[in-house]
């Protein structure tokens, strides 16, 4: 019984620690890697097939398992 209680407390503690460690600011969570569409430098988005809205992207090109999005004025 004490082993089950210990595992339960371990899971609850890890969930609390993970939620407290998660950054709330979008700029902290956005760690884009540079990519190139021809000679234009953009930001690579993994597992997306089109650019996300609200970031000012005007063009994109397909990359391996994602998309490279670039703004109007790079």
Swiss-Prot record:
Propeptide: 22-29
InterPro entries documented for this protein: BDS_K_chnl_tox, Myo_ane_neurotoxin_sf
Keywords for the protein's UniProt record, in alphabetical order: Cleavage on pair of basic residues, Disulfide bond, Ion channel impairing toxin, Nematocyst, Neurotoxin, Potassium channel impairing toxin, Secreted, Signal, Toxin, Voltage-gated potassium channel impairing toxin
Keyword Disulfide bond appears in the UniProt entry: yes
S-S bridge residues: 35-68, 37-61, 51-69
Subcellular location: Secreted; Nematocyst
Pfam families the UniProt entry points to: Defensin_4
Organism domain of life: Eukaryota
Any single GO CC term annotated in Swiss-Prot or TrEMBL for this entry: nematocyst
UniProt GO MF annotations: ion channel inhibitor activity; potassium channel regulator activity; toxin activity
Gene3D superfamilies according to UniProt: Anthopleurin-A (2.20.20.10)
Signal peptide residue numbers: 1-21
Additional note from the record: Negative results: does not show effect on crabs.
Role this protein plays: Potently and selectively inhibits voltage-gated potassium channels Kv11/KCNH/ERG. Acts as a gating-modifier toxin that shifts the voltage-dependence of ERG activation in the positive direction and suppresses its current amplitudes elicited by strong depolarizing pulses that maximally activate the channels.
Family: Belongs to the sea anemone type 3 (BDS) potassium channel toxin family.
Protein name: U-actitoxin-Bgr3a
């Amino acid at each position: 019984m004490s082993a089950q209680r210990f595992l339960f407390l371990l899971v609850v503690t890890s969930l609390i620690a993970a939620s407290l460690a998660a950054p709330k600011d979008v700029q902290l969570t956005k760690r884009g890697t540079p990519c190139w569409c021809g000679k234009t430098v953009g930001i690579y988005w993994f597992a997306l097939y089109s650019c996300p809205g609200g970031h000012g992207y005007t063009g994109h090109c397909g990359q391996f398992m994602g998309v490279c999005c670039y703004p109007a004025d790079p």
